[in-house]
């Protein structure tokens, strides 16, 4: 998972995509005329103000029920009736908070991806300076979140699964921007003393490799109950490490004898 993304194969690590990450959700400012909000400078539709006025416990309970439903059934197969029942709220109240199921889905997905983003940002501070080790450790860091949060992990994976659906197209559009910032942060403070040639071109080669590597890896997995994220981590890191060794040593064995 270290550098590219599962969100509609947008590019870089396995599931979440640090090369194409979400464009924010930090500050929420309500408009007085409707319930539109500004998120990091962009207009997004968020839940009605009444939802934010609920107790934190109730909001968490509703979100948890929605995560469970979306992760198990996906967007298309999910039932708002089951969400309402599992959240313990009155029928119809859910749509006092959200205009429709799609708005609810993206709000929940935003929350989950924001949680992953903050986890990666915090963990990235302790990554090694050596470039190739840093990429591998970042992969392990991201997988560790999925292992701890399998339900949320399935939700993120499922968001990218239906590549031809209108919702997945919106997922890709929503989360593909501003990824370069995350990629740049991954390369901050690295030890470049051992790199040869143009450093920017080296970074570009790594980015292209990670995008292709992750897209290929992602085609071989699918969201399902009881996903073995530990096994996926082992396979991913082992394969990534093998390719990192090839990149470090080069693909030529030496000059041919004449």
Please tell me what each predicted stretch does.
Residues 146-167, 215-226:
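Amphipathic alpha-helical segments used for helix-helix packing
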Residues 114-117, 121, 125, 129, ...:
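Amphipathic alpha-helical packing segments from all-alpha helical-bundle domains
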Residues 65-69, 145:
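Short amphipathic alpha-helical elements of helix-turn-helix/winged-helix folds
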Residues 61, 69-103, 107:
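Helix-turn-helix
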Residues 6-45, 184-188, 212-258:
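C-terminal peripheral helix-coil segments that are non-catalytic and often amphipathic
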Residues 72-76, 127, 149:
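Short coil/turn segments at alpha/beta junctions that flank glycine-rich nucleotide-binding fingerprints
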